[in-house]
Every structure is written in structure tokens, then in C-alpha cells.
Amino acid sequence: MFRFVGRSGFALRGSLQLRKDVLRSRTTAVAKRHYSSSNGNNGGGFSSAILSVLGGSLIGGGFVAYALGSQFEKEKSVSDLSIARLEDLDSPEYCDKETFAKALVELKDVLENDPENFTVAKDDLDAHSDTYFNSHHAEANQRPEIVLYPRNTEDVSKLLKICHKYSIPVIPFSGGTSLEGHFLPTRPGSCVVLDISKYLNKIIQLNKEDLDVVVQGGVPWEELNEYLNDHGLLFGCDPGPGAQIAGCIANSCSGTNAYRYGTMKENVVNITMCMADGTIVKTKRRPRKSSAGYNLNGLIIGSEGTLGIVTEATIKCHVRSTFETVAVVPFPTVSDAASCSSHLIQAGIQLNAMELLDDNMMKIINQSGATSKDNWVESPTLFFKIGGRSEQIIQEVIKEVEKIASQHNNTKFEFATDEDSKLELWEARKVALWSTIDTGRKTNPDANIWTTDVAVPISKFADVINATKEEMNASGLLTSLVGHAGDGNFHAFIIYNTEQRKTAETIVENMVKRAIDAEGTCTGEHGVGIGKRDYLLEEVGEDTVAVMRKLKLALDPKRILNPDKIFKIDPNDHQH
């Protein structure tokens, strides 16, 4: 449930006039005091009656000045400090129905009033508000008024200028695969969605010699990888199916290949985006590195659409391994598998990917029939991608992996012998989420899924994932774990019905607490969205979040871009 109670106080945008009024009242009070003092020793003086009236006026005026002065100090505390505390803000003010109707005419004009470029159909509004696999769902009234399909960066800019002028909340949308309520329309009644996936979905230019590619924000990452594959290249990140480049940037995605190729933060050269007021900004040119000015890429990556809307980006490409195989290694316990992964990292073994699936996950994959193979060993399993410039290099790495795995009690070591078996073996990892959903719904058609993630330092990975596994097993719910073991990041899949929601919440809460206590993070790659705002506070503290809020207010003072995500922007927001 996501509610706000009431609206109070002055709007921030009224602060300039407020300060003028306060200064005027203070100047008047000073002038009165000066006038009284200069005439106080004059023989005639004021009569007691006049002094009484004047005194009462000054007391009344003083009360007003005090009240305005208190508000002035509140405004001053926001503007003069390096942070923006929630309690120092007033609630954002968005446009009313009448104003929105006027704005809607202008928004449609930008899109040439072509019904192909916008929609108000109920199914489309629903699809842009929630998904069945989201961990946090919109309420029935939380729907946008319209979904807009801009055709290019200039359209996005023009639409945002109108939304900024009329104070209309804007939800950026691309693939719609995020899991923490990132695109919930928390401000219904005057909210619009800007969906870039319909038109801004082109691969613009491959600079093969420089190992980068220029793409629009609505390009699906799988489509980009297929294109790059023909050139012997790949996109380093591999998030969930359906994710698009703008969303990958907004959520700072990573995926199974991050161990070798890095997360989105390491794979973006530059970003073209539209700010809240419609200003078009390109973060930098196309060098592999730069120390010129602020790192705007780093600011925007992971900002979840709260600071700007990404329309185009230059992305790093990586040379594909000449040879690559997949190995599958089961272990008796999650602790054994996790300890093996940490040992491999600390030994400096070069792998393209290293993934951990627990015994429940392996059982679910067998039951789901989602892969061509249905006799997986149903115990915690590590999946490896091993690549190199020659078969000899791969064989040497396999021997090293086998040696370390044997020290952690592995029960089997299977590796691909050809391209088909390689795809078959890795397929189990990529269908994990969907296998869990399908299995849960076969058991209970009304089942919900809670998918969440944390990340911890490598040395803490085994302890944290093992403790989480024990709690999940004891819960009585259908649960499974999947880990990007190479970077200490793991995911929990929890199937529950409405009556079991509290149990699921407790599992997630304890999982996050363990991660933070282990000097980790509440989310390694899913992002904060609505679902983890309180956990972010626990992780980094009030003042650090207040710095983030200050940046938000500086770049989006009307708070129209994806409001209420990552942290609270409204003191009347009482959702936890």
C-alpha cells in the first residue's frame, strides 16, 4: 500500500516571494523601532494610549514575523545546507485535473495528435503500472493518465518541458522488467508515462576499432548482443530477459557476466539524456577515459529515472573469447559451493562467469521442464563459463577449477563438449526466475513471487548466503537462491500467498540485515525503487540519503521525475 496523508506548508517554489515578504516585515519592524527610539526623549513623547495600541500592534506583528521567520529559517536550512532533510521540505505540488487537461492538449500536439504515439487504453495503462513478477504492486487507483511514445530525443525534451511547466509527474519506461516497484505511478491523477521502447530502439553506430557502440535507450540488450556477435563482440552486462539499455543504465544492471566484464557502471562511455526541465545533456564525448569535470555518467547510472531520462548512450564492447566452454559442478551444501567460489576468486582464476544455484532451484528446473535436460543433480551447483584464446588455455583453467572444487567436496564435474551442450548447460541458469514462477503457479494459481537481491564482500559471501538459506528452508515457503558468486551478489526467489506475505517480508528483512551487517548492500543490481528505501537509510545513513535528496532537488526542483523512488521526497509519505 502506498499512501500520502494531507498536504501542508508553503511550496518550495514560493520561497522567493516568502523571503521578500519576510524581509519587508523585518525592515518595517526595524523602522518602527528606530522611529520610537529617536523620539523617546522628546519632551512631548507618545501618550500612554498610543503606546498601548502601538505595543499591541508590535506584539501582533512580532508574532506574524516570528511565524514567517520560522518558515524562512526552514527554507534557508534547505537552500544553504549541503543536504536536504525530509522534515525540512514541504510536500511537492502537482497539477490539478483542470490544468492537466490543458497540458494534455500540448502533449498530444508534440506527438502530432497521432494515436500511434500515445495511448489511454486500460490494458496499456495497467501494463505500464505493474507486472505480475514485481515484488511491490500498484494499488487499483495508481495508474497514469496517458502513456506517451516519443519518437526521438527532441520529443522527449519537448514533452518534459510541458510537464515541467505544469508540474506533471513523469514515469520513465523502457523494458519494464525491474522488480522493486520502480515504475509504480505513486502520484495518480495527473501522471504520465514516457515509454521510449516503441521508437527509440535503434543501434546507431558501431565503432569496432574503438570497441564501442552508439545505441538508443530502447534497444533490448539481447538484440544488441546478437548484433555484436556478428562482429565477434559482446555487451558485457547480461541482465534479465527483456531489459533495455535505458533501464540497464537507470538501474545500474549487471548480470552473470559482471564477474569478467563489470557492471553497467564500467560499461558506459557517455549518456545523452533529457533533464526534468527538458534540457538535453550529453555527459561527455567518446574517450575510453576522462578526468574532465564531474563524473555525470556515475551520477546518472543507478539513478532510476529520478534525475533524467536516458535517450541514447555509447556502450563499451568486449571481444568474445575465441573458445569458451561451460562447466557444471554440484556440491553437498550451499556453504561448500559458496566457499569454493570465494577460493577461486582469491586464487585469481580467470573465469568469464561463475553462478550458484541452490538445491531447491535445481529441483525446480527439473520439475518445470524449462530446459532440454531434466535430470540435473538436485544439490547446490556452481555454473562456470571458462574462456580463452585457445583450447589449451581452457583446459588449464578447467584443471585449476577442478583442483579447487575438490577441496570443497564437489560431487561431480561436467563440462560442455560442443556448442549445443554449452548452451544446454548454461540454459539452466538463465531460466531460473521463470522456472520458479511457473512452478509456484502450478502449485497455487494465485501465488505471488518476491524476488530480491543483496551483495556482500567476497569473504562474507558463504556465511551470509548459508544463513539466508537456513531461514528460507525453515519458513515453509517455496524458496530458492541464485547467486552471482563472482561478485558476492545473490538473489532470493520466494513464492507466497496473501496470508504468507508477512513471512516473506521477514525473510527479506533478515536477508538485507545480514548483508548490511556484513558491510554489504541492500541491493547489488535490482536497485532501490519503492521496496528498499528504508533499507537504503539503514545502509548509508540519514545524512548520505539527504545528500542524494539535495542532488535530486537541484536537478529536479519540482520533483516530477519518477517521484518517490530511491528515497522519500515528501514528508507526508508514510509508506514503509
Swiss-Prot record:
- Cofactor(s) listed in the protein's UniProt record: FAD; Zn(2+)
State if Lipid metabolism is listed as a keyword.
no
Which keywords does the record carry?
A: FAD, Flavoprotein, Mitochondrion, Oxidoreductase, Transit peptide, Zinc
Main localisation, per the record? mitochondrion
Per its record, what are the GO molecular function terms? D-lactate dehydrogenase (cytochrome) activity; D-lactate dehydrogenase activity; FAD binding
Per the record, what are the reactions this protein catalyses? (R)-lactate + 2 Fe(III)-[cytochrome c] = 2 Fe(II)-[cytochrome c] + pyruvate + 2 H(+)
Q: Mind telling me which SUPFAM superfamilies this protein's record contains?
A: FAD-binding/transporter-associated domain-like, FAD-linked oxidases, C-terminal domain
The places in or outside the cell where this protein is found are: Mitochondrion matrix
- Which intervals hold domain FAD-binding PCMH-type? 139-320
What PANTHER family does this protein's entry cite? D-LACTATE DEHYDROGENASE (PTHR11748), D-LACTATE DEHYDROGENASE, MITOCHONDRIAL-RELATED (PTHR11748:SF111)
* Record-given protein name: D-lactate dehydrogenase [cytochrome], mitochondrial
The species this protein was found in = Kluyveromyces lactis (strain ATCC 8585 / CBS 2359 / DSM 70799 / NBRC 1267 / NRRL Y-1140 / WM37)
